[in-house]
Curated annotation (Swiss-Prot):
Pfam families: ABC_tran, CysA_C_terminal, TOBE_3. Its main location: membrane. Its EC number is 7.3.2.3. The lineage of its organism: Bacteria, Pseudomonadati, Pseudomonadota, Gammaproteobacteria, Pasteurellales. The keyword Oxidoreductase does not apply. It is a peripheral membrane protein. Coiled coil: none annotated. Residues 3-237 form the ABC transporter domain. This is Sulfate/thiosulfate import ATP-binding protein CysA.
Amino acid sequence: MSIKIENLEKHFGSFHALKNINLQFKQNQLTALLGPSGCGKTTLLRIIAGLEFADSGKILFEHRDVTDLSAKDRGVGFVFQHYALFQNMTVYDNVAFGLRVKPRKERPSKEEIQQKVTALLKLVKLDWLANAYPNQLSGGQRQRIALARSLAVQPKVLLLDEPFGALDAQVRKELRRWLRDLHQELNVTSIFVTHDQDEALDVSDRIVVMNQGQIEQIDEPNQIYHAPQTPFVTQFVGDVNVFHGHIDEGNLVIGEFSHKIDPATNTTQPVNNQSATAYIRPYELTISRHADNALATGKITHINAIGFIVRIEIESAQSDQPIEVILTKAAYSQSQYKVNEQIYLVPDKLNLFQQMNI
């Protein structure tokens, strides 16, 4: 089922939580609402669910206006960050709960409930824990049971609010992979909220990046990472080094350094005499012992050679923050850079935002 949001506004007192949100969720797609705390992503999810109501605007489920309907009349499944399982019920009874409390005319038979619950427990790969209680499960297992319980009532839309936020890093990684595979089997429109960029990039078909109650960019994960459209998205999704300067005759000038901008690798056409900010990924910077076409100079302060890449930190007068460069082990072995060595930085690619774009 597709979902359409039209001109949505929401205030909490004087706080403007959502500002004219217009958005479409395609049928059977897994969409991430990504952004920092307070950006409005959870408020938007709760309004879609019917747990909150907008001040103005519309919510359409497959062209049906559900703006004023309660949560129980919208046919959505909701998974919270903190499981919300019934502690006095077994795993089986938790999953069966939504089916058992349906109105008598809609309630499946005991046999149908048993078949449905058994199938769902197999789907989440926890059928062997049917008779266990929540306090006997790990955090990851509890969240999978919470998801199975939401799916039991066959929701038209599945909504997940930071579903892995309470779990440790390794379990989160495992469940991300599991959720991605599971969604391909389910054929249900799913929306999940996260502040974790890796989670959004790894799991979703599409990402909606939000900031201060507004949508910054809507795109596929690859485009969000490699072709961010605003300075906020550029800095929020992935690591970047930031350099402030101005444009002069097709060059980015930072202090005494003038870097010739290559139109083939720069994301925007430079405009003369404009202030500009360059965002450069750590792997898009080259370290050199020569000043040719350099953007900055600095001193190496730290080298981390653990793993299959080498991370090098550099202090530079041309940047407000320490600069990070990522090299392959082979490139590092050839160059043999040392801590306290003075080097130059040459960008392979610039993501440039000029004053008129900011």
